[in-house]
């Protein structure tokens, strides 16, 4: 989730390692901010009024919108000469981030993730071919 959130806000003009560090920091910050907004994971949310929570949410959403507008604006300012290199760098970074996220996903999840994926695929397969379930039940 951190990497997925961070991809939206990565400064694409910077090198890869600082970009990944930035994404993790921004992802953590946004994760805690949204947990705070929704009231999950914090005991203090009971003491905060709804008015304060709405004001904080509007502030965070405004900041996110400003970051998106800034990055899209700077992206449009790139010259056509640098556009090919820019797109190539984006593609390489996204592939690298995707590979890292898959490795982290399998390492942290372990057997629980494998079991849940098997369950999901079995349900998906059942909806595609329901006659399989009758064969399984008859055995």
Swiss-Prot record:
Its main location: membrane. This is Uncharacterized protein MJ1489.1. It comes from Methanocaldococcus jannaschii (strain ATCC 43067 / DSM 2661 / JAL-1 / JCM 10045 / NBRC 100440) (Methanococcus jannaschii). It is found in: Cell membrane. Keywords: Cell membrane, Membrane, Transmembrane, Transmembrane helix. The chain crosses the membrane at residues 19-39, 64-84, 89-109. It is a multi-pass membrane protein. One of its GO terms (cellular component) is plasma membrane.
């Amino acid at each position: 989730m951190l990497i997925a959130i961070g991809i939206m806000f990565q400064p694409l003009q910077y090198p890869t390692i600082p970009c990944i560090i930035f994404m993790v920091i921004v992802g953590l910050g946004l994760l805690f901010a949204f947990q705070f907004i929704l009231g999950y994971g914090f005991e203090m949310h009971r003491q905060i009024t709804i008015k304060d929570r709405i004001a904080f949410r509007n502030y965070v959403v405004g900041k996110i919108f400003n970051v998106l507008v800034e990055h899209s604006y700077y992206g449009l300012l790139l010259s056509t000469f640098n556009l090919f290199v820019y797109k190539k760098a984006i593609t390489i970074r996204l592939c690298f981030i995707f590979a890292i996220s898959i490795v982290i996903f399998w390492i942290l999840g372990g057997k629980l993730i494998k079991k849940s994926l098997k369950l999901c695929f079995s349900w998906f397969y059942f909806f595609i071919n329901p006659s399989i379930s009758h064969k399984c039940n008859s055995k």
